């Protein structure tokens, strides 16, 4: 990621600095994806260098993992051998009940896995542009799909109200990612469960009723 090309960079750095007091020596931290998270990792690296602390990171994306590997104070862990003390991530949208749309960066499965695996909370770093009254106002819903099931999944999504399906490429897990538009359908936990029941769906970008703490 080219840091100089990140939009609203200074605002995102200010957000990133708000979680620095959560970092302690020896912790295992789940790390999401996206530009705000990328900048937060850079700020955490500065803190680790200054304090001579070390942490274990469990990144949700290959891009964040590569960034972490560049710092000698960060060890890359996994969910088999490590337990996450706390996590942080960004969001594409957040509603009044702290439900989220995530996955625009194609890392939604591992992001959700981190959030489900943390012992405490996940800090969600968001600026004012991410807040919406109703999920789906600004972004389509990302859905991660086993590649050979794309056509079948698309047909099944249309049966439950999808009006537009856009192929967006591949995830770090070598699955396909599609963005799905629903009209006259609430993007909520009920819909997330419906989508997950479709054979071939790996995960959805709906994050409903998770233990999160909003940082804004």
Q: Locations of the language-model features?
A:
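Conserved phosphate- and dinucleotide-binding cores of soluble alpha/beta proteins
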Residues: 2, 62-216
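N-terminal active-site beta-alpha-beta segment that forms phosphate/nucleotide-binding
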Residues: 2-89
């Amino acid at each position: 990621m080219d840091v100089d090309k990140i939009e609203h960079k200074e605002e995102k750095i200010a957000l990133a600095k708000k979680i620095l007091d959560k970092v302690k020596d020896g912790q295992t931290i789940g790390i999401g994806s996206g530009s705000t998270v990328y900048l937060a990792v850079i700020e955490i690296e500065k803190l680790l260098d200054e304090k001579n602390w070390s942490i274990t990171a469990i990144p949700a994306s290959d891009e964040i993992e590569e960034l972490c590997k560049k710092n000698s104070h960060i060890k890359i862990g996994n969910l088999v051998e490590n337990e996450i003390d706390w996590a942080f991530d960004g969001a594409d949208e957040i509603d009044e009940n702290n439900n989220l749309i995530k996955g625009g960066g194609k890392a939604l499965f591992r992001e959700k896995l981190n959030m489900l695996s943390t012992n405490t909370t996940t800090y969600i770093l968001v600026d004012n542009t991410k807040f919406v009254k109703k999920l789906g106002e600004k972004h389509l819903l990302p859905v991660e799909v086993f590649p050979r099931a794309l056509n079948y999944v698309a047909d099944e999504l249309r049966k439950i109200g999808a009006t537009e399906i856009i192929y967006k490429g591949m995830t770090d897990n070598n699955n396909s990612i599609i963005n799905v538009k629903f009209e006259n359908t609430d993007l909520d936990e009920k819909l997330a469960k419906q989508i997950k029941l479709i054979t071939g769906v790996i995960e959805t970008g709906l994050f409903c009723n998770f233990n999160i703490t909003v940082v804004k």
